[in-house]
Every structure is written in structure tokens, then in C-alpha cells.
């Protein structure tokens, strides 16, 4: 039974010997969270480039970026402050509601794919417990990113302004409003 197998594997962490691995998983959540944000934003940027045929900008973190680079038509700026926040900027003037919905949905889809791939690795390949702990941190980081963006909420923005989550943007589009309208 897979459920009992999962519980047995989890129980390895809830012992005095498992405490270091539990701490490693916890710390890796914070280490991987900026990468989870970048993956999520790439989920938005790829269809935005396809639909707009223009350059798209990804910004991760707050303040002036300390790292600037481009990959094809995607300009990336990364700041080391508040790296759990990010956004993808693109021209949405001539996009249909279907295209906008796809752009907003693909960020969470990329986060979900990152979780799914890591979970499948954890359950199909026998890694050392330290690597399992890192994979658990990776899953949790991407799951937090997914939940933060799917729930229809106003989120704390990188510059202290409230920004709508992807879920809220999609609901606004379905109600016939432009994504930035309340």
C-alpha cells in the first residue's frame, strides 16, 4: 500500500536521528524559494513572448536588480531583496482573454510541474536521506509558490504595493474585467 509506505518513509524524519534531515528540508525551503519564483515567472514569460512576439521582462525581488541578463526575448532582473516576490511584465493590449488567462495560468502550472517532477523522483528513486530532504524542500518551495499564486488574493508586492495573485487575475478576466481592474 503506497499510503502506508509514504507514512513509513515520513516517520524516518520524526526521530532524533531524523532531526538533522528535517532541519535540512526546512532550510532548503528558504534556499529554493527564489528558484521557485524564477520557475514560476518563466511559466508566465514563455507564453507571453509567444503571444505578444515582443520582449518580456521577469523581475524577481525588490529594489534595483543586482543581476541582469537575457535569454532570447526574455529580460531577467534579479534583486537579492525579497526574492519570494516576482512579476512578469508584458504588453497585453492586443491579447484575447483566452491568451491572458493562459499567461496567468502557466505560472502556477510550472510551479505544479516542479512539485510533480520532484515528488516522482522522491518516490521512484532511492536517494540518500540528505538528498530526499533537499527534494522535500524543493517540493515545499514550489508548493508555497503555487498556493500563493492560485488563491484569489491581493498579495504583498515587492515594493510594498498590493498586487493581485494569478488566481485573482484569472477570476477578473472571467468576469469580463481587465486583469488590473478591481
Describe the function of each predicted region.
Residues 93-182:
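Hydrophobic transmembrane alpha-helical segments that form the core helix bundle
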Amino acid at each position: 500500500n503506497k499510503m502506508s509506505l509514504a507514512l513509513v518513509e515520513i516517520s524516518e524524519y520524526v526521530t532524533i536521528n531524523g532531526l538533522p534531515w528535517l532541519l535540512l528540508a526546512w532550510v532548503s525551503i528558504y534556499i529554493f524559494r527564489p528558484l521557485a519564483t524564477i520557475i514560476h515567472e518563466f511559466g508566465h514569460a514563455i507564453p507571453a513572448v509567444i503571444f505578444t512576439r515582443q520582449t518580456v521582462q521577469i523581475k524577481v525581488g525588490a529594489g534595483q536588480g543586482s543581476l541582469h541578463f537575457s535569454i532570447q526575448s526574455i529580460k531577467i532582473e534579479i534583486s537579492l531583496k525579497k526574492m519570494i516576490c516576482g512579476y512578469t511584465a508584458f504588453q497585453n493590449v492586443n491579447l484575447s482573454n483566452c491568451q491572458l488567462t493562459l499567461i496567468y495560468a502557466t505560472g502556477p502550472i510550472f510551479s505544479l510541474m516542479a512539485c510533480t517532477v520532484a515528488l516522482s523522483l522522491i518516490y521512484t528513486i532511492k536517494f540518500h536521506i540528505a538528498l530526499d530532504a533537499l527534494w522535500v524542500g524543493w517540493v515545499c518551495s514550489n508548493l508555497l509558490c503555487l498556493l500563493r499564486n492560485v488563491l484569489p488574493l491581493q498579495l504583498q508586492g515587492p515594493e510594498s504595493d498590493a498586487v493581485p495573485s494569478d488566481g485573482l487575475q484569472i477570476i477578473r478576466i472571467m468576469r469580463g474585467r481587465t486583469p488590473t481592474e478591481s
